A protein has these predicted regions:
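An acidic, low-aromatic, low-complexity terminal/linker signal
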Residues: 1-171
Length: 171
């Protein structure tokens, strides 16, 4: 990850990105698409890389741009702006590489800004407005709102077979 991602916002406490068990805090990687700020739990993120060449996959899900190679492994790339139906004029320049239940997948985003330490009291459940199943929470920052996304739901939409595995692991 870039140096700008290693800085965490804390209340005067700079412990880094690892938290003690039992705290009422968690950390998110904040990123943007269009004019909207989103977050993903840092525990699901393996790394953030700059956009890399992609190999198209015939008959892939419409959200999949193709495959990219990372350290010799082919990883599917989800076009997150397309998946979220967010209009943007900027060219996405970062890939958030995630690992969720041993399944690696990359998410194309416009810009990754930083890591934040968040108190659970600063997060609210997502309001029930339309189909918001991809948003699990709203985080209120001083000058903006960050939408915490449910990446498991996005993966399940793309690949129902993976959904069965995710459901099995959770039981």
């Amino acid at each position: 990850m870039g140096a700008n991602l290693m800085a965490t916002e804390t209340s005067g406490d700079k412990k880094g990105i690892l938290l003690e068990t039992g705290t009422n805090e968690f950390e998110i990687v904040e990123f943007s698409i269009g004019q909207v700020n989103y977050g993903i739990n840092v525990a699901k993120v393996r790394e953030v890389i700059t956009r890399t060449p992609v190999t198209n996959m015939p008959q892939a899900h419409p959200y999949i741009d193709g495959l990219f190679t990372l350290r010799g492994k082919a990883i599917p790339l989800v076009n997150l702006p397309r998946c979220l139906n967010v209009e943007t004029n900027a060219e996405p320049k970062n890939i958030i590489v995630t690992e969720i239940n041993n399944y690696k997948i990359g998410f194309l985003v416009e810009n990754v800004s930083r890591i934040h330490r968040i108190s659970w009291k600063d997060m609210e459940p997502a309001p029930e407005v339309g189909d918001q199943s991809r948003v699990v929470g709203i985080i209120k920052m001083e000058d903006r709102i960050v939408l915490l996304l449910d990446f498991e739901t996005i993966i399940a939409e793309i690949n129902p077979e993976i959904n069965a595995k995710l459901t099995t692991y959770e039981d």
